[in-house]
């Protein structure tokens, strides 16, 4: 099932609660929340207290993407803040197995992400323990970047590996996703699409979400 996860990174941080409610009414499935520490990536966004403050404004799945150096230290903070899905990077400094285990034992779904320069095969040893893999189609850290089409073989390789091992997980793509770019990742097996400016910058967010869902669904 296709899911659209608008990224709050493209929204107005001064109205996060209102915008979370708005995109839910517009037909979004998840709310993607990018947490950046200024170390793992150059930018700084927000942390667990902000996420907690908007949790009661929306019933959407809170999809928390930790672009931080030591995710293990902060997992429980984001669990308590109301995260439903917690994604961390294979390139982070935290032990992967221990971090996944803590996320799942705390009642959240666990996901691993790979930067553009990281082989997707790096997550293969952990697939049995994951609910999702996030393939970055831009360099993480800033919104509004151009979609990297050369990341598409990663989606195909991941989907093939999952099918070979009878593993059923979500494949998420994040970066430059819009109605113009969603077709190819959907055709290759992606199921969750993070869209920032394509939703928050649209004159009609509901129309933008519906259009992306329709295009992606027709490619499955």
What are these regions (language model features)?
Residues 190-195, 200-201:
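Acidic, Mg2+-coordinating phosphoryl-transfer loop and its flanking beta/alpha structural elements
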Residues 113-117:
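Short gly/ser/thr-rich secondary-structure transition/capping motifs
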Residues 176-188:
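Acidic, divalent-metal-coordinating active-site segment for phosphoryl/phosphodiester hydrolysis
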Residues 138-140:
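Short glycine-rich anion-binding loops that position phosphate/pyrophosphate groups of nucleotides
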Residues 1-87, 93-95, 102, 110, ...:
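Conserved N-terminal beta1-alpha1 strand-loop-helix module at the mouth
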Residues 32, 172-173:
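Generic enzyme active-site microenvironment
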């Amino acid at each position: 099932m296709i899911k659209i996860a608008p990224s709050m990174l493209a929204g107005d941080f001064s109205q996060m609660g209102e915008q979370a409610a708005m995109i839910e009414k517009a037909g979004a499935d998840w709310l993607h929340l990018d947490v950046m520490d200024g170390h793992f990536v150059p930018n700084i966004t927000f942390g667990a207290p902000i996420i907690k403050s908007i949790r009661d404004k929306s019933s959407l799945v809170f999809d928390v993407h930790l672009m931080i150096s030591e995710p293990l230290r902060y997992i429980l903070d984001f669990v308590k803040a109301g995260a439903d899905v917690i994604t961390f990077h294979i390139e982070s400094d935290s032990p992967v197995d221990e971090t996944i285990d803590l996320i799942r034992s705390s009642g959240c779904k666990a996901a691993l992400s790979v930067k553009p320069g990281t082989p997707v095969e790096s997550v293969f040893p952990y697939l049995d323990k994951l609910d999702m893999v996030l393939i970055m189609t831009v360099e993480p850290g800033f919104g509004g970047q151009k979609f990297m089409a050369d990341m598409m073989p990663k989606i195909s390789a991941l989907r093939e590996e999952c099918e070979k091992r009878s593993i059923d997980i979500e494949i998420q793509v994040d970066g430059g996703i819009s109605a113009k770019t969603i077709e190819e990742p959907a055709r290759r097996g992606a199921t969750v699409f993070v869209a920032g400016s394509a939703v928050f910058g649209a004159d009609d967010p509901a129309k933008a979400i519906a259009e992306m869902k329709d295009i992606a669904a027709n490619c499955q």
